[in-house]
From Swiss-Prot:
Low complexity: bias regions: 1668-1681
NCBIfam families hit by this protein: PT_fungal_PKS
Recorded GO MF terms: 3-oxoacyl-[acyl-carrier-protein] synthase activity; fatty acid synthase activity; phosphopantetheine binding
Segments of this protein annotated with the region Disordered: 1668-1695
Renumbered residue ranges of the record's region N-terminal hotdog fold: 1326-1461
UniProt note: domains: Multidomain protein; including a starter unit:ACP transacylase (SAT) that selects the starter unit; a ketosynthase (KS) that catalyzes repeated decarboxylative condensation to elongate the polyketide backbone; a malonyl-CoA:ACP transacylase (MAT) that selects and transfers the extender unit malonyl-CoA; a product template (PT) domain that controls the immediate cyclization regioselectivity of the reactive polyketide backbone; and an acyl-carrier protein (ACP) that serves as the tether of the growing and completed polyketide via its phosphopantetheinyl arm.
Region (Product template (PT) domain): 1322-1641
Protein name: Atrochrysone carboxylic acid synthase
Catalytic activity: holo-[ACP] + 8 malonyl-CoA + 8 H(+) = atrochrysone carboxyl-[ACP] + 8 CO2 + 8 CoA + 2 H2O
GO process annotations (BP): fatty acid biosynthetic process; secondary metabolite biosynthetic process
Cited InterPro entries: Ac_transferase_dom_sf, ACP-like_sf, Acyl_transferase_dom, Acyl_Trfase/lysoPLipase, Ketoacyl_synth_AS, Ketoacyl_synth_C, Ketoacyl_synth_N, Malonyl_transacylase_ACP-bd
Span of domain Ketosynthase family 3 (KS3): 402-836
Lineage: Eukaryota, Fungi, Dikarya, Ascomycota, Pezizomycotina
Region (N-terminal acylcarrier protein transacylase domain (SAT)): 38-269
Length: 1771
């Protein structure tokens, strides 16, 4: 019939959709389909798919647990329901129906879910015109969709469908077995339970069956029956034996065409067999009850028997109907077709779409019927299966555990001279076997080798594969002394070196990206022996025996050097250590514990015992050569050295980081050969199982693997077992590899031997190089003929051993995949699946015409080496991109203190620069070791602006453009015109814009430039703005918001245009000083607008006035230049606008406290406070003189800037640079941002290059980030090491002759500690060690450990010179605590009176040791002869582990007083104090006194001397004038520790005095610092309360006796009362050069005071800590270090002088030559660490009579510093 769509609204489109779930697997390649679904489940877009697979697996595990043991044992362990595809035999066994049902429902629903997750916009199952159909298990899958409101619901419902499919299969198997039993473990293909007869009618078949059944007397359960029929065929079912008999004996059936169906699980569609009880057994479960309570049927499903939708109101009813259908009803697909046609006629849709997995016979029949019955109707089918094979290139892992792992860096030291990966490849490609006789630096092979095996402890083989000179090491680079380097295992040292090289090649820069955050990087190294510790360093156990020899310190040392916070693991699994380590690193990356992993393996052979032991265990080959893998005479392996490091990341992180991806790990796993005949014997079955596991998890077909790198040790058993497992999995005979899928195998041990702990990663490195070179190198292990146990049919399996070099090129659309296999002698097996890295296409272009290229090193020798390597690279790669070169050398490399950098625009410039560097490298000086220089921003005035600018950055730098557009939008929002036309080059350069536009454009450009510099890490510590430039400066300093800045600039420009006449005034630049102009002006009128330098002055006035003065000055020989400006700033021309402008600024702008010091050209001083800059200031700055010269001089005088300051000029052209250089003539560096007539990037790159060479830490990654997609990381040469050979030779033959007994020593138990009396137990008074009370007298001794956490935190809360210092407030708390304790002891029932902590005198400061693991104790003794005297005496001493306490370093008294008397005595003084406070307020308002915010005050304090922690920072604001100040104080409410009077309370109210003495410009703090040795009294009449608000006031006055000593009284006020006072607080001034000496920690808790022998030192020291020089006692033993160091004969120091002897002693202890001790050498870089410092200090005392502190090398960090000090005091 013709189909006519229903009439409705014109243009209405109505679609009917039918989704069909088949009863056949939708793919012939079921394993391939499962792999693809598994891979998709790892994608972030397919989290529902992943959840469905997880839930389905859990459901089946629950069902399996309920099976009888006989059935349960048939099932293998499974990680996923998809695992069952790997066991095709199970689909023909007793549970075949369950397995098929599980697999079919899983793949159908997984495919369905995944498709609509991929194309979510096509998921439309809400429509009323949606129907479902299915056959068999497909009906259950359809039910999952019917019951789900959303796609996510299908994961939940679907898992129950899979459960039901499994239960259905179990039921059918149980019932069918009663009809025809079978063996549980059936073999071969079982008989079918169903046959199909095509081209026959149901009636004919049924008639014949009726005849047969009536005549034979067959029981009802044994009858053959029709289970399905259609117009084209009939299916009959029954017990297999009866079916076979039927088709053998019946003429009707025998003579017809028929075929059996793969129905092996039993009978279905048999209403004579199954009952409702069976249905309920399948459906009625607890999970189903829960499901039915949550979901309802929503979409109708056609019944295959009736053709009508299942009549179900609940989920349970729906499933019962479906299970009943499957078990009892005949399939009648024609009814489904008719049902669909009926619905089409009812709905009259415009389109009928059938969604299928793939086209099948039922769908053919359906579509044929639709097209026949409904003419002119659009009917379509849509297949969803093709989606599964689609592999998205942009796949994003769903979570870290689904990520691939990229290898992005590699480095090695391997036998055969393979000191890098290229040389290693040469060994492989040339097919070299690099074995040799054991070299003499390991042990004497002549004495330690016995081929007969009769001598004790001797090796049976003299051969191995060895690294050349494994002792080579650049010790200073890694901050190790030669002595420590010599005692450190070369495995550890080479791990450090190769880790650095691998990271360098990986482009690692700390914290460059999230994945390179140092907190998220871990190290993982495999190591299985400690030869060097056991043999070499054990000959003379010394300081570094443990740290240098124990294997845990290897990866730990890498973490420590690079400051990685992630885990560090040393892993030992014998021969598989390094590949197991790779798996451990992958696991860490997969579980999210780390983001980057440095991974490797190490093995350096020096112990003859291991050779002997392996010989006795029959592991080693006696035949010359490396491992003879697969050779007929293979008799064991050949030992080998090796050190390899790799860098690994998750693939998505590596791609985001723009790394070079060398290879990608798809999977890694380890198992154990538990069923092997012995622990060391391999097991093919376990290895094959591991291969299958790792391939399945990786989602890789074994036939897609084209190379397997075998363990291949060269043993008869091992080679056979491994090859068997490889052939079984990768090249089986049953499913053979196609001709275009050859499999190659190889073993690197044939080239470089068996590296044991490093073997696995050596094999991995080989495969990485093969991928890189696209070549499979020849296998050289077969020296004679192949091992006869190896299968003879390798060619038949398409498996090949490459006897010659083979090509291994990439195939478009298909990745090369390899497997690396590794065994452990302890029974473990580890395998890794490796894929070639993705090809990264560059996108975009780098528009920058100039590029910074740099080379750096830690030593001059290495700098020269790096330069030579770099030049050689350029010669070899003449066409290299400068963009890539800059990106690699700047953003992807470490930058050391020896730096060379230049901005170049072409290869020729680069070559010239390299030549210049080569000529000058010997005279190169490193950057300062004290840290990067401070940076100052100078903002240019309007004179630098063009009329119309074309700022290239606006077009080429996205961040700059965005900033400018944002600022322009802000300006327009305030009613100003857009200023973009003035900077975008849209107008000619001479086009004059309005002043509003011009000035806004300049300010906007300056703000954007400043923000850009700051984004590059060039952040100012001070700013200055010249005239108009001061607006941008104030914004960067935090005073003005961007909006207010533009508002003030724009409104002032508007006022100028409205009230002033352009051109009526003029400005004149004169090359003369103000005084010179005044002298010769001769009464001519002018105003001084700007004083820019000593002889750089700008005048302003009317045009005539300026003409007159100019002519006069020029006649006197002074150069004059008229400035082209529309208005003459800082002149009378602005007078008409000033009042209005001030009003506008008052109302329209908010002025914030500065977060940076501001050098004010208006005031000629530096602004720190939040009161100075206001509307009046803006008025004055517009009108009054710009005294740039005076402002800079003031800033220099008060040390806001100094000679090291790097100046960056912010503006379109450098103007201020000249002013700065003329005023601050010794300034080292000034650079511009832009320069008129020069391309922007040329200027910026030159400036960046200069800043970089000056030591500024530029964020180079941020510089390159906008263009990174167009940039590639180059594989440049690695660092050129300044290597020396550090090696302790094993001497003699004691390893052979040693006995078999061991000596042991017992440590005597320390004497029991007497029970100590109880005490206050506060943070400062921790325990009472002695006390005696006799009547009214008392003596108490307490001891405290400065390393106790609360006390140590308190000390580090008052940090000086980077050290934690016990502040005087801590001593005060000790005094108050002990005073309270003693008084209560003697007067237990009496309230403790107020206490005056008086007469505090600190002779020597107490500085916290850096080593917090050892106690640092001090002792305080308090005595009184009579408590009624109301006086206590206190003395402080240092206490050490051995020996008596030191002489007192501090003393004080406690007076018990009446607080009310104090209050009365202070009352007359109150008005005087308040009067001074008010006077200071007035001075601050007038701009005479300085007002500081609390934050600024403490920043200044920290920059000068003391860096306070937050709890100590009580001062909220300070007003200071010269030596007088007051502060508003709020005490912290943060609690930490147990105190009597918290030190941070005392400090907060009292340290205003210290602030004055170290910050006030009345004292030269640039050259001096001031500390307090104590006070006369400290009294608090009221307790200091957390959160309390106080005011402190003090005026410091120099003493008459000594002008370096100052005294003052600190008054503490609260609520207009004096409640406390620190009377007579004393400060002494010291030269700043003594700061290091006074404030450095003693590095040993056993330190004793050095008395009388130290150089001159202050006689009084700070309570806030001046350190004592200390000597240390330590015992050292020196390993054999070869020749003693030689004294440099050319040294200008007398060789017999103390200085020369001291340097010789340093060289000896450190194990270096005196010639290494150049004046600029830094001891820390030479490896003189804290431990060695203690040893050297003791040697100085013993051998030279020079007593020094353990911190000597902190005070004198360079050789030159130490030499100068020694010459000064000991010449």
């Amino acid at each position: 019939m013709d189909f006519t769509p229903s009439t409705g609204t014109p243009g209405e489109f109505r679609r009917m959709k039918l989704t069909y779930f088949t009863n056949e697997f939708p793919s012939d390649d079921l394993p391939g389909l499962a792999r693809q679904l598994h891979l998709h489940s790892k994608d972030r877009r397919h989290h529902i798919l992943a959840r469905f697979l997880q839930d389905a697996t859990l459901a089946i595990r629950e069902e399996v647990a309920q099976l009888p043991p006989a059935l349960k044992d048939l099932l293998p362990p499974f990680e996923s329901v998809l695992t069952f595809v790997e066991y095709p035999e199970m689909r023909k066994g007793p549970l075949c129906g369950s397995i098929d049902g599980v697999l079919l429902s899983t793949v159908e629903l997984a495919t369905f879910i995944g498709y609509f997750e991929e194309f979510p916009e096509t998921y439309d199952f809400e429509s009323a015109h949606t129907y479902l159909a299915g056959l068999g298990i497909g009906l259950l899958s359809a039910a999952a969709v019917s019951l789900s409101r959303t796609l996510a619901d299908i994961a939940y419902v679907g898992s129950e469908v899979v459960r039901m499919a499994f239960r259905l299969g179990v039921l059918v198997d149980n019932v069918s077995e009663q009809l025809q039993p079978r063996e549980l473990a059936s073999h071969g293909t079982p008989d079918s339970w169903a046959y199909v007869l095509p081209n026959v009618t149901r009636e004919a078949v049924q008639q014949e069956l009726d005849v047969i059944h009536s005549g034979e007397g067959i029981p009802e359960t044994g009858k053959i029956f029709v289970s399905a029929f259609s117009q084209s065929s009939v299916t009959v079912s029954g017990p297999p034996s009866r079916l076979k008999d039927l088709f053998r004996t019946s003429d009707f059936f025998r003579d017809r065409r028929f075929f059996s169906l793969p129905v092996f699980g039993g009978l279905c569609h048999a209403k004579h067999i199954y009952t409702e009880t069976h249905v309920q057994q399948v459906v009625r479960t607890k999970p189903m009850d829960m499901l039915s309570a949550r979901v309802l049927p929503r979409i109708p499903i056609f019944s295959p028997s009736s053709g009508s939708p299942f009549p179900a109101a609940t989920a349970t009813e729906l499933f019962e109907g479906i299970i009943s259908e499957i078990l009892t009803q005949v399939i009648q697909w024609d009814n489904v077709i008719q049902g669909a046609l009926d619905q089409i006629n009812i709905l009259s849709p415009s389109e009928f779409q059938v969604l299928v997995f793939r086209i099948s016979l039922p769908i053919h029949d359906l579509m044929a019927a639709v097209n026949t019955e409904l003419k002119g109707f659009q009917a379509t089918t849509k297949e969803i299966m093709p989606w599964v094979s689609h592999t998205a290139k942009d796949r994003i892992p769903r979570e870290p555990s689904q990520s691939k792992i990229a290898i992005v860096g590699m480095s090695c030291r391997l036998p055969g001279g393979a000191t890098n990966t290229e040389k290693f490849w040469d060994v492989l490609e040339q097919g070299l076997d690099v074995y040799r006789t054991i070299p003499p630096d390991r042990f004497d092979v002549n004495t330690h080798y016995d081929p007969a095996g009769k001598r004790v402890n001797a090796s049976h083989t003299p051969y191995g594969c060895f690294i050349e000179e494994p002792g080579l090491f650049d010790a200073p680079f890694f901050n190790m002394s030669p002595r420590e380097a010599q005692q450190t295992d070369p495995m550890q040292r080479l791990a450090l070196v190769t880790a650095y090289e691998a990271l360098e090649r990986a482009g690692y820069v700390p914290n460059r990206t999230p994945a390179t955050n140092k907190h998220r990087i871990g190290t993982f190294y495999g190591q299985a022996s400690d030869d060097y510790r056991e043999v070499n360093t054990a000959q003379d156990v010394d300081t570094y025996f443990i740290t240098g020899g124990c294997r845990a310190f290897g990866p730990g040392r890498i973490n420590y050097f690079f400051k990685f916070w992630g885990p560090s693991y040393s892993i030992d699994t014998a021969c598989s250590s390094s590949l197991a380590t790779v798996e451990a690193a992958c696991t860490s990356l997969w579980n999210g514990s780390t983001d980057t992993a440095v991974v490797g393996g190490v093995n350096v052979l020096t112990n003859s015992d291991a050779f002997a032991g392996l010989s006795r265990g029959h592991f080693l080959s006696k035949i010359p050569g490396a491992c003879k893998t697969w050779d007929c005479n293979a008799d064991g392996y050949c030992r080998a050295d090796g050190v390899i490091s790799l860098v690994m990341k998750r693939l998505e992180d590596a791609q985001a980081d723009n790394d070079n991806i060398l290879g990608v790990i798809l999977g890694a796993a380890t198992n154990h050969s538990a069923d092997a005949v012995s622990i060391t014997h391999p097991h093919a079955g376990a290895q094959a199982h591991l291969f299958r596991d790792v391939l399945r998890n990786a989602g890789v077909d074994s036939h897609d693997v084209s190379y397997v790198e075998l363990h291949g040790t060269g043993t008869q058993a091992g080679d056979f077992e491994e090859m068997k497992s490889v052939t079984d999995v990768f090249a089986p005979l049953t499913k053979r590899r196609s001709p275009n899928q050859p499999l190659y195998v190889g073993a690197v041990k044939a080239n470089v031997g068996h590296g044991e702990a490093v073997a696995g990663v050596t094999a991995l490195l080989k495969v990485l190089l093969m991928l890189q070179k696209s070549v499979i190198p020849p296998h050289v292990g077969i020296k004679n003929s192949i091992n006869p146990q190896i299968p003879k049919d390798l060619d038949k399996r398409n498996l090949h051993i490459p006897y010659e070099k083979q090509s291994w090129k990439s195939t478009p659309g298909k990745s090369r995949i390899a497997v690396v296999n590794n065994f452990s002698a302890a029974g473990g097996n580890t395998s890794v699946v490796l894929e070639e890295g993705p090809v990264t296409e560059l996108t975009g272009v780098d528009p920058r015409p100039s590029h910074v290229v740099a080379i750096s090193a830690k030593s001059k020798v290495s700098l020269k080496g790096n330069l030579e390597r770099f030049a050689a690279y350029i010669d070899t790669n003449p066409g290299v991109s400068l963009s890539h070169l800059s990106y690699t050398t700047m953003a992807r490399r470490h930058h050391h203190n020896h730096r060379l950098a230049a901005a170049v625009s072409d290869a020729e410039q680069l070559k010239k620069q390299l030549t210049s560097w080569m000529q000058s490298v010997e005279s190169h000086r490193p950057i300062s070791a004290t840290g990067p220089p401070p940076v100052a921003f100078a903002f240019t005035g309007q004179g630098a602006s063009y009329k119309s600018m074309n700022v290239e950055l606006f077009h080429t730098l996205p961040s700059f453009r965005e900033q400018m557009m944002h600022l322009d939008a802000l300006a327009q929002q305030q009613g100003f015109p857009s200023f973009i036309p003035a900077i975008d080059g849209s107008h000619p350069q001479d086009h004059a814009h309005s002043q509003v536009v011009t000035q806004l454009a300049l300010t906007g450009t300056q703000i954007a430039l400043a923000k850009y510099w700051m984004s590059l890490g060039v952040r100012p510590e001070v700013v200055v703005g010249h005239s108009l430039g001061e607006f941008a400066a104030l914004h960067i300093a935090g005073v003005l918001s961007a909006g207010d800045t533009l508002f003030l600039v724009g409104r002032r420009a508007q006022l100028l245009e409205q009230h002033c006449v352009q051109g009526s005034y003029q400005m004149l630049a004169v090359r003369a000083s103000v005084s010179q102009i005044e002298e010769i002006a001769d009464g001519r009128l002018y105003e001084v607008a700007c004083i820019n330098g000593p002889k750089e002055t700008v005048l302003s006035g009317t045009r005539q006035e300026i003409r007159n003065i100019a002519e006069h000055l020029m006649t006197k020989g002074y150069k004059c230049t008229a400035l082209e400006v529309a208005f003459a700033g800082h002149s009378a021309q602005l007078d008409p606008i000033l009042d209005t402008y001030e009003q506008i600024a008052t109302k329209g702008a908010i002025f914030h406290p500065p977060n940076l010091p501001i050098i004010s050209p208006l005031l000629g001083k530096v602004i720190f406070d939040d009161k100075t800059v206001n509307a009046t200031y803006m008025r004055r700055a517009s009108r009054e003189t710009v005294n740039f010269h005076a402002a800079l001089e003031t800033a220099q005088r008060i040390s806001t800037v100094d000679d090291t300051t790097a100046w960056v000029e912010i503006g379109p052209h450098p103007v201020c640079m000249g002013f700065i250089r003329s005023t601050l003539q010794s300034t080292a560096l000034t650079v511009p941002s832009l320069r008129r007539g020069e391309e922007s990037w040329v200027t910026i790159t030159r400036s960046l290059s200069s800043l970089h060479c000056a030591g500024v830490e530029v964020h180079w990654n941020e510089f390159h980030r906008p263009f990174e997609q167009a940039l590639r990381l180059l594989d440049l040469p690695t660092y050129s090491w300044n290597d020396k050979n550090y090696w302790i030779q094993y001497n003699g033959d004691w390893a052979l002759t040693k006995g078999n007994t061991f000596y042991s020593s017992q440590q005597q138990n320390s004497a029991a500690v007497d029970e100590l009396p109880s005490g206050p137990r506060t943070s400062t008074v921790q325990k009472i060690v002695e006390e005696s009370f006799d009547g009214r007298a008392a003596r108490v001794v307490m001891q405290s450990d400065l390393m106790q956490s609360d006390l140590l935190e308190a000390a580090y809360g008052h940090k000086m010179n980077g050290c934690g210092v016990v502040t005087s407030s801590i001593h005060a708390d000790v005094g108050f605590t002990l005073g309270q304790y003693v008084y209560k002891k003697l007067n237990p029932n009496t309230k403790v009176p107020a206490m005056n902590m008086a007469s505090l005198e600190v002779l020597k400061g107490l500085v916290a040791n850096k080593n917090t693991d050892k106690p640092q104790r001090f002792q305080v003794t308090v005595t009184t002869t009579d408590i009624n005297s109301r006086i206590l005496q206190l003395e402080w001493r240092n206490v050490h582990a051995h020996g008596p306490a030191e002489e007192p370093f501090a003393s004080a008294k406690i007076y018990y007083c009446d607080a009310s008397e104090w209050l009365l005595s202070w009352r007359p003084t109150l008005h005087l104090v308040q009067g001074r406070i008010q006077a200071l307020e007035r001075l601050a308002e007038a701009g005479i006194a300085n007002r500081f915010s609390g934050r600024m005050a403490y920043n200044l304090f920290a920059n000068s001397l003391v860096d306070y922690a937050g709890k100590y920072r009580g001062m909220q604001s300070v007003v200071m004038h010269e030596l007088e100040a007051f502060a508003d104080v709020t005490l912290t409410v943060e609690k930490a520790g147990t105190w009597t009077v918290p030190p941070y309370f005392i400090d907060s109210v009292a340290h205003l005095a210290g602030f004055i003495m170290n910050v006030s410009d009345a004292i030269d703090n640039q050259k001096n610092f001031c500390v307090t040795p104590g006070w006369n009294s400290m009294r608090f009449a009221a307790p200091l309360v957390a959160g309390g608000r106080y005011r402190s006031y003090v005026k410091m006055i120099p003493t008459v006796e000594d002008d370096s000593v100052y005294l003052g009284d600190v008054y503490i006020l609260q609520n207009d009362m004096i409640i406390g006072m620190v009377g007579g607080i004393k400060f002494r001034r010291y030269p700043r050069l003594l700061l290091n000496r006074f404030f450095s920690p003693s590095d040993d808790s056993t330190a004793k005071t050095a008395a009388g022998e130290t150089p001159p030192a202050p006689t009084t020291t700070a309570a806030t800590a001046i350190t004592a020089a200390t000597s240390t006692t330590s015992t050292t033993s020196t390993a054999s270090t070869g020749q003693p160091p030689k004294v440099d004969e050319t040294s200008p120091v007398d060789s017999n002088s103390t200085a020369a002897r001291a340097l010789a002693l340093v060289a000896k202890e450190a194990g270096m030559e005196v010639t290494d001790l150049q004046d600029d050498a830094i001891f820390a870089n030479l490896g003189v660490d804290s431990l060695m410092s203690l040893v050297i200090a003791e040697k100085f005392r013993e051998e030279l009579g020079v007593v020094v502190a353990g911190s000597l090398f902190l005070e004198y960090p360079t050789v030159g510093d130490l030499k100068s000090w020694l010459l000064e005091y000991y010449s």
